[in-house]
């Protein structure tokens, strides 16, 4: 689905698009690493994924600086049970028999048992539960090509 041209977007919208692309790229690099049988190639893709994670942190930092409403959401703590309270009514239970055992009930959400939590992470560790740290002091605030301050990439390095 094509969106508006980049020239029609404001800075916050551009950063959100970059953030979405960075997150997708992390998934791709990590999948490539898992699929590789060569340890050196696997390490290469893990290295690339780690760099993308730094970009995600930087993009979130920029969003927090530019969008006070978004920043308010990052600063808001999540209490245990927050996500369970927000769930819609459970879908109809589907009974799936096991090949050589009794039937058990699955609620249809990613094949999880009804008693299984959606994540094993504590609520305060979820993406929106922790504020993103600012970029490291010794690092460039922006590290992508022409955006990099002090040179790098093919841009002017202003």
From Swiss-Prot:
Residues 148-158 have a biased composition (Gly residues). Its main location: other. It comes from the Bacteria. The gene is encB. This is Encapsulin nanocompartment cargo protein EncB. It comes from Myxococcus xanthus (strain DK1622). Residues 142-149 are annotated as: Probable targeting peptide. The encapsulin and a cargo construct (an encB-encC-encD fusion) can be overexpressed in E.coli and in human HEK293T cells. In HEK293T in the presence of 0.5 M ferrous ammonium sulfate nanocompartments can be detected and used as cell markers. Coexpression of this nanocompartment with a larger nanocompartment from Q.thermotolerans (AC A0A0F5HPP7) allows of expression of different sized iron-rich particles. The encapsulin shell proteins are not seen to mix. It is found in: Encapsulin nanocompartment. Disruption phenotype: Forms wild-type fruiting bodies. Pfam families: EncFtn-like (PF22277). Cargo protein of a type 1 encapsulin nanocompartment. May help nucleate Fe atoms in the interior of the encapsulin nanocompartment. Present in about 36 copies/encapsulin nanocompartment. GO terms for biological process: intracellular iron ion homeostasis.
């Amino acid at each position: 689905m094509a969106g508006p041209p980049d020239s029609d977007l404001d800075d916050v919208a551009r950063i959100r698009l970059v953030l979405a692309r960075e997150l997708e790229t992390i998934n791709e690099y990590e999948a490539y690493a898992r699929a590789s049988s060569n340890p050196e190639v696997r390490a290469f893709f893990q290295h690339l994924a780690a760099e993308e994670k730094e970009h995600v942190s930087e993009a979130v930092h920029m969003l927090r600086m530019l969008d006070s409403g978004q920043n308010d959401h990052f600063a808001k703590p999540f209490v245990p049970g927050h996500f369970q309270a927000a769930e819609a009514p459970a879908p109809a239970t589907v009974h799936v028999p096991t090949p050589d055992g009794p039937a058990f009930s699955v609620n249809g959400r990613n094949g999880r048992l009804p008693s299984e939590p959606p994540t094993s992470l504590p609520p305060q560790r979820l993406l929106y539960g922790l504020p993103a740290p600012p970029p490291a002091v010794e690092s460039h605030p922006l590290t992508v090509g022409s955006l990099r301050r002090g040179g790098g990439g093919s841009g002017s390095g202003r």
